[in-house]
Amino acid sequence: MRIGLMIGPERGRYATKVDRLRADARWADQAGLATVWVPQIPDEFDALTAAALAGAETSRIEVGTAVVPIQPRHPIALAQQALSTQAVCGGRLSLGLGVSHHWIVDEMLGLPYERPAATMRAYLDVLDPALGGPGPVDVENELFRVHNPLDITDVGPTPVLLAALGPAMLQLAGERTDGTLLWMADERAIGSHIVPRLTRAAEAAGRPPPRVVAGIPVCLCRDDEVDAAVARTNRILAEAEVSPNYQQLLDRGDAREVGDLLAAGGEAAVERRLRSFADAGATDISVRVVPIGDDRDQLVASLRRTRAFLAELTTSFASPAAPASPGEPASPAVESKAVDTGAGSR
């Protein structure tokens, strides 16, 4: 199983946002992690722009978006941005896409949120050839009429993963993409709902085994601090729970809130919980570090402890190198001074 790290800016700390994002990407690259995942938050950095920054600062690690909503962007516009980012990343970009949520697309953006799976299928009809390499894109379907040349990079096809939670999107992800990106999915939801549907669809389409990237909050702490870590996780990450999409996914598992997904405690407890996701069928873990503490110094120390342990786990989990240019990772001792105080929840 591959271990990746969610990175992203803290809200409100404007002067150092870019430097901190770069530092986080460098740390993950040098520490040997498989992937850095950049979230798309409605009021924050654009994920593909941030991914380009991360790619320019690194040489080995996979850089992924988690996830870019399709509704605000024409598929050719997204393809241009993704291919431009791929050129910066040197072939290390994986494009995570999603249909977002009704309360974002309709209520915040004023765009229609209808037939999301059908919309994504029509979108991929355009995006697939656009990401496949230089040349014309000629597609006409129920939503798009496109006759557009693209000649941005000759880097091979850009991997695409879908934020697929329900049966229709899982079917589409297995048929047409490289896998799925998950949030709010516990072990039972992954093992009994996600993996079987996704795998069957991929097999029927003659595609290779799909990736299953599970987003998991993690806090390395003492046993007597676990309750505080759970409370903090619920406080800073509970916003997603209001989405019907995530509620339906929670209903398919044993978790009832995001704190139930937290891998917390000592090294053995954290490793055991992460391995339980691998046993359920996750191919990747995208770690959202949740630091705890009463002040900024304690938060920084907590974040560093958890990250250092993640670097150690990459070896014991035998995470393969991400598809990237060759390069030996440096010592994981290099650490960013940034700390996520919880503002940048997904």
Give the role of each language-model region.
Residues M1-R346:
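Active-site-adjacent structural elements that line small-molecule/cofactor binding pockets in enzymes
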